[in-house]
């Protein structure tokens, strides 16, 4: 079954399949009256979201559209649909949220500019899932009555499997609202461009762009020189900068490159080889490590292990390096990359030129141990040259390429892969580039995850934390009080990231 499913998804991720699906959809739609009393509805025409519906109809008057999905035993799911004009006479959208295998009653509400509304109801049995994920996640901490967790959907990014891989959408009640198959490996985050496309990785080789209806408009293969890993970001031109591994290297160094993918042509260019930028440090490390983006790789040299990239408006970039527990600022990434400064424990880089580039810690707090998901936050209330930076601090001290380094130099760090007492942390820094300092402005303990994991500040001020190796994700208030938490069964070792998206302007 898995081999057949893998082959099916491989076919979905081809231009021929997507074009064929487009043609079939247009033929079927043309045979329908597609009025509000007889809407054209079909399941997942592009094979990219198992439980979704494609809906098309016209109305005599201009209306906005919203819908509510109801299935017995589950909380209702309500969304306003995106339309280019708020009120329109032609309506075409992807409807999310059906419960697989159950009778779903969908109330579609049409509202005109005067606020007058009318509702049409359709019934549809939800499609069977392709994966084995739970429809209702376990609530390890249920939100108090009246607690507002905000809108949007949790995107589960990387519950890696040896079988078929997916990205999942769950609502704030822990109910499955979308199953997006990918080729293999994982999607690391969602990027939205100015043309209404959502970009994500579908394998170590593929970046794809999906439109609002679920069609894969662009499917780019990175080619034979590089594979992607861990993260990517969109630059000011709409191109995508990716963390990458250079294939075919004599030294087998991995996860130490940044490349750029042109979203208009699919061409790939190298931006920086950190092995060249930090040649002395690389040479000082032991040839060791693994490459989880290439399970067949042998004798890898994972001396830096970048796991996050953040692009800044001035052309600089921030990188998180797990192997050195360092945050690295690089200037002019796309033209002439040079080191600006580093944040973290300086003694890791002792004896190298880079050791003098560390910002000064201001205050009494611990540095990070293998941080993930660093996020740059500009704030208009801050003077020029200052910004906030938050992250998931794994608080795990280890380095296969620095086996003799004593990580206990970092106060409170754990050196145990498995521990009943260790905690990871959410941390937020204020970085003052003018003074050359960083200080901690917020932190709290979260469930221990020595590897992977993510943190995300939400629009409502709450903080979403994924403790990946525990299979736990939840929302906290700014004081670190846990408001709600869910547990997802792990397919193998961890859930790489969980980010929340409201998908406004898309679905």
Residue ranges and their predicted role:
Residues 72-86:
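Solvent-exposed serine/threonine-rich low-complexity stretches and specific carbohydrate-binding patches
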Residues 3-69, 88-92, 96-103, 107-507:
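Histidine-/acidic-rich catalytic cores in large beta-rich domains
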